Design a protein with these regions (language model features):
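Rossmann-fold NAD(P)-binding glycine/threonine-rich loop
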Residues: 101-124
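Helix N-cap at the beta1-alpha1 junction of Rossmann-like dinucleotide-binding domains, i.e.
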Residues: 33-37
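Active-site-lining helix/loop region of Rossmann-like oxidoreductase modules
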Residues: 7, 142-196
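Rossmann-fold cofactor-recognition segment
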Residues: 45-59
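Beta-loop-alpha module in the N-terminal Rossmann-like domain of NAD(P)-dependent dehydrogenases
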Residues: 62, 74-91, 105-106
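Hydrophobic/small residue at the entry helix of a nucleotide-binding pocket
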Residues: 12-13
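Conserved Rossmann-fold cofactor-binding substructure of NAD(P)-dependent oxidoreductases
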Residues: 57-70
Length: 196
């Protein structure tokens, strides 16, 4: 049985916890700053193998104490990007595998530096984009002898938009604003370049 701590019981974290629990090979601890969402999720869906817990990464000593009392193999952070360096530090301290869904380049670089030489896997950017979209783009490129340009777009565009952005907010609003407000990078002529 694999033991995983999922931090953040929003839409994505709750979905991850459900999918892992339904596999039947995971013991999931679902942590959030209150018990309301994780507990309701477990009760409403009658999930077995999911333990709701109150964890707030703004108090890393408390999270560390929880990890000492409830050993897990991995942490998956579905928290806002700015929380992930703290979570990665906890994973390093406790010798755990680390995964996150961040899109933030600076945070990813911090985690890369933090995890240098770690004995366990540190895998930031495991979400849809970057993450899956990078894997899909790579696979598509392998089907061609030469590739000039690859443009992949990802979005949650609802049939009936209900907000000014005309976008479905299925993930962190903090992350969405951060992603659209910061410089992004691409590869041109084999070199990493900033894009406007």
């Amino acid at each position: 049985m694999h033991r995983v701590l999922v931090l953040g019981a929003g839409k994505i974290g709750s979905l991850v916890a459900c999918l892992l629990a339904q596999r039947g090979t995971y013991e999931v601890h679902l942590g959030d700053i209150t018990l309301t969402t994780p507990k309701r999720l477990v009760e409403d869906l009658r999930l077995e193998g999911v333990t709701p817990c109150i964890l707030d990464v703004r108090h890393p000593d408390a999270v560390s104490a929880y990890l000492s009392a409830h050993p897990v193999d991995a942490i998956l952070s579905s928290l806002p990007y700015f929380c992930n360096p703290t979570v990665a530090g906890l994973a390093l301290t406790h010798g755990l595998h680390y995964f996150d869904l961040t899109e933030d380049i600076e945070v990813t670089n911090q985690i890369k530096i933090l995890s240098a030489g770690a004995a366990h896997a540190f895998m930031p950017q495991c979400g849809l984009a970057p993450g899956f979209i990078s894997i899909a783009a790579h696979d598509l490129m392998t089907h061609f002898e030469t590739v000039d340009t690859v443009k992949m777009r990802v979005g949650a565009l609802p049939v009936h938009p209900s907000n000014a952005l005309k976008y479905s907010l299925t993930w962190s609003t903090d992350g969405l604003i951060n992603e659209y407000g910061n410089l992004c990078y691409g590869i041109e002529a084999g070199a990493k370049v900033p894009l406007q």
